[in-house]
Amino acid sequence: MVAIVTLTRQVLLTIALALFAQGAAIPEEAAKRDDNPGFVALDFDVLRKPLNLTEALLREKRDSISLSLINEGPSYASKVSVGSNKQQQTVIIDTGSSDFWVVDSNAQCGKGVDCKSSGTFTPSSSSSYKNLGAAFTIRYGDGSTSQGTWGKDTVTINGVSITGQQIADVTQTSVDQGILGIGYTSNEAVYDTSGRQTTPNYDNVPVTLKKQGKIRTNAYSLYLNSPSAETGTIIFGGVDNAKYSGKLVAEQVTSSQPLTISLASVNLKGSSFSFGDGALLDSGTTLTYFPSDFAAQLADKAGARLVQVARDQYLYFIDCNTDTSGTTVFNFGNGAKITVPNTEYVYQNGDGTCLWGIQPSDDTILGDNFLRHAYYLLYNLDANTISIAQVKYTTDSSISAV
């Protein structure tokens, strides 16, 4: 989910990476070795909505994308606590945005939005809350917005607390629940609707975790688990070495806003298609997106057809009975290679048709249908690298700090 940070000033296809459910326990043996192992592990729940163009034709979450993106698939929600009295919030973890905001207990929810069902925050009941008196505004590309006030308070993630964390207390929103953005600080929503900077860029949650000694490196790894799984894990400052095969290959980030690495080529149905440009890895985006010309090459090979679904809006559809055997291979600039089963590219729509899992856009985005197979995603914001390896779906765990 990527926040739109206009000079007015937010993010869903994103992340919308926003945090995930039931905190994952640190392995007992690690706890015995060191009370502070240098990482914080957190489980999350996978929240799924079916793709349905009749209800939500197009959704997108970033200002740099002119063609709307579909985000009716999974999102990733986790429980965190805010305040001296640990007020519990279930928030979406989002790698594409950078701000942590919660829903105020007196917030006004947009029409048809139940924004308070995942937990609310009452600043006056937290003795550690400090109102910064600056306006917070963030806008998503799908038109949803959140407004409120910047403040600081204690944030607790799976029993690990950081103090004085800058957060936004949202009093008006058309978003379903709060979002924990964990991207670069350069992508923070620090401008109001007139383009005036209301607060300086600040230490967001990953940065604060490092500065307060909870993790050793401003990095996090993401395990989205299998397509049918109900839970996954994010580890701040660590990596689970049991969750991938082969070795992690570090790819240099080519753009910090958003997190982009170089994609060299794509192999599909026996043909190799050279690409040679940047690709954004975004946990808040459901499908995979390529510029129109490149998407057309892949579509021709896959047998997908372009259909006009709205004014100036085209999507690829594919026969629901198409042969989904085989794989699509993504080759990255520094040698990383990720194999994705072709079952990830046929999506049942609500009307009996099937969407193709690759769609046209002005920008290249590798969404959840790619990321589920690319564990490990180790985002190292200190080294400006994203390390990836082929996923290994397993309940085994072997976490180490990075």
Swiss-Prot record:
MF-aspect GO terms: aspartic-type endopeptidase activity
Q: Where is the active site?
A: 94, 282
Q: What is its EC number?
A: 3.4.23.24
Q: Which residues form a coiled coil?
A: none
Q: Which reaction does it catalyse?
A: Preferential cleavage at the carboxyl of hydrophobic amino acids, but fails to cleave 15-Leu-|-Tyr-16, 16-Tyr-|-Leu-17 and 24-Phe-|-Phe-25 of insulin B chain. Activates trypsinogen, and degrades keratin
Q: Which cysteines are joined by disulfide bonds?
A: 109-115, 320-354
Q: How would you classify this enzyme at the top EC level?
A: hydrolase
UniProt propeptide residues: 26-62
Peptidase A1 domain residues: 76-389
Query: Which positions does UniProt annotate with glycan attachment?
Result: 52
- Signal peptide range in chain numbering: 1-25
Top-rank taxon, per record: Eukaryota
Q: Does the keyword Phosphoprotein apply?
A: no
Cellular component annotations (GO), alphabetically ordered: extracellular region
GO biological process per UniProt: proteolysis
InterPro entries per record = Aspartic_peptidase_A1, Aspartic_peptidase_AS, PEPTIDASE_A1, Peptidase_aspartic_dom_sf, SAP-like
The protein's PTM annotation reads: O-glycosylated.
Major localisation: secreted
A Pfam family this chain is assigned to = Asp
Which keywords has UniProt assigned to this entry? Aspartyl protease, Cleavage on pair of basic residues, Disulfide bond, Glycoprotein, Hydrolase, Protease, Secreted, Signal, Zymogen
The record's subcellular location field reads: Secreted
The entry's family comment says:
Belongs to the peptidase A1 family.
This protein is called: Candidapepsin-1
Per the UniProt record, the source organism is Candida parapsilosis
